[in-house]
Amino acid sequence: MTNIHNDKILILDFGAQYTQLIARRIRELGVYCEIWAWDHNPAEIAGFGAKGIILSGGPESTTLPGAPAAPQEVFDSGLPIFGICYGMQTLAAQLGGATEAADQREFGHAEVNVINPDALFKGLSDHGGEPKLNVWMSHGDHVSVAPPGFTITATTDRIPVAAMANEEKRWYGVQFHPEVTHTLQGQALLRRFVVDVCGCQTLWTAANIIDDQITRVREQVGDDEVILGLSGGVDSSVVAALLHKAIGEKLTCVFVDTGLLRWQEGDQVMAMFAEHMGVKVVRVNAADRYFAALEGVSDPEAKRKIIGNLFVEIFDEESNKLKNAKWLAQGTIYPDVIESAGSKTGKAHVIKSHHNVGGLPEHMKLGLVEPLRELFKDEVRRLGVELGLPRTMVYRHPFPGPGLGVRILGEVKREYAELLAKADAIFIDELRKADLYDKTSQAFAVFLPVKSVGVVGDARAYEWVIALRAVETIDFMTAHWAHLPYEFLGTVSNRIINELRGVSRVVYDISGKPPATIEWE
């Protein structure tokens, strides 16, 4: 079988907000890549076996002493190098060029003039054949003098070196960000570096990743049994489908129905995995235990801890019944791995174990199976579709680990959870009907534990308030509230109030992030 990890790119991260985006763009081209810190062990960088190295952007300044720099091994490797933003600046500074601080930062759209087309720029244009490109800039410093052996390949009205190249050594630098969509030819530039210059084959596809992981899992677990906590979320669902394909009956999924899930989610999970796919699923109806444990608790952090600890307790009880289970499968994905890494600089991204179940008892002594640990979320979704999971499940909006427990403000009660689950289902149903679901990044209902006066028939009634929240975001770090049509919101409000006894008022949350968070608790 072809090794889909053979042709790979190494990204050295200098702390840029866009570094993961570079990696995702390269993966989209069909090429495997990893993100390591700029100060990673140089011997490991040299021994990684990359076909090319990308130096990312970053917040530092090469004009200051002690600025982060690429290890000498990068230049000694003989590999193609592509410096982006700060990556180009450190390339210039380390190889005998010069950088300087600009009078003012350049942030936003810019027009680049290609003056000496190289392997990356040849034939590219956003202006009907003219050698001009529309790009996205985000920098304070810039390269003022290209290093010896480099040709200036592009300029702008504001900076003398917008791009440079040493074609003989296959070293390239650009001051702008090809990884963001605002740079219209960005993906074409990355393709030219990764595929044309570095010679990478495009083997990183959903079908190949599935085949590769099936082989790896079978080699790892042999004839042992594997246990998986199935939540109904995207990651654990894809792990369940993938492992079922790899080891069949040797997989047991434990689905803990907390009573805090989406409307009828427990039945949907059982229908999809147990009935439709034939996966062995143990369903634990634990709602009574959860509501008892949460009684009288209103602090959000305390609620999260109780919900998390109780899950671990129940999962432990169920795993003890499976005497032959030697492995625990988890839906750890690559951003989890990156975030869990640390170094002397705080910027290292070394692959190491990350427990997304959190706090599993030491005595479980199970080996870890993490078939998604190399993948970004968008890749996990593509795998899900390839594995035959319904698109509506794979592309669902995020749902918090503690479930409705953090969407009910204050104390959690069974009656609140049932009302909220139904209200949320109405909101989502109407979003789908109006073709608005995929246009929002996350949408949900929140239960407010305050009673508001309403009129039911001829009588006054004091009933609960439901808040609706919908946001649009690229990375969930910042978000705008979704400008849903008034008529649509009116339809949702009418349905919730008419169909749910106990709700007299529906409000819409128009707060951005920041200052508000996406979830209310």
Curated annotation (Swiss-Prot):
Residues reported in the UniProt entry to bind ATP: S231, G232, G233, V234, D235, S236, S237
A GO molecular-function annotation: ATP binding
Known pathway: Purine metabolism; GMP biosynthesis; GMP from XMP (L-Gln route): step 1/1
Matching Pfam families: GATase, GMP_synt_C, NAD_synthase
Broadest EC class assigned to this enzyme: ligase
CDD domains associated with the record: GATase1_GMP_Synthase, GMP_synthase_C
EC number per UniProt: 6.3.5.2
Catalysed reaction, written as an equation: XMP + L-glutamine + ATP + H2O = GMP + L-glutamate + AMP + diphosphate + 2 H(+)
GO cellular component: cytosol
Annotated GMPS ATP-PPase domain residues: 204-396
Keywords: ATP-binding, Glutamine amidotransferase, GMP biosynthesis, Ligase, Nucleotide-binding, Purine biosynthesis
Domain Glutamine amidotransferase type-1: 8-203
Active site, UniProt feature: C85 (nucleophile), H177, E179
The UniProt record lists the keyword ATP-binding: yes
InterPro entries: Class_I_gatase-like, GATASE, GMP_synth_C, GMP_synth_GATase, GMP_synthase, GMPS_ATP_PPase_dom, NAD/GMP_synthase, Rossmann-like_a/b/a_fold
Chain's role: Catalyzes the synthesis of GMP from XMP.
HAMAP family (alphabetical): GMP_synthase
Assembly mode: Homodimer.
Name of the protein in question: GMP synthase [glutamine-hydrolyzing]
Native organism taxonomy: Bacteria, Pseudomonadati, Pseudomonadota, Gammaproteobacteria, Lysobacterales
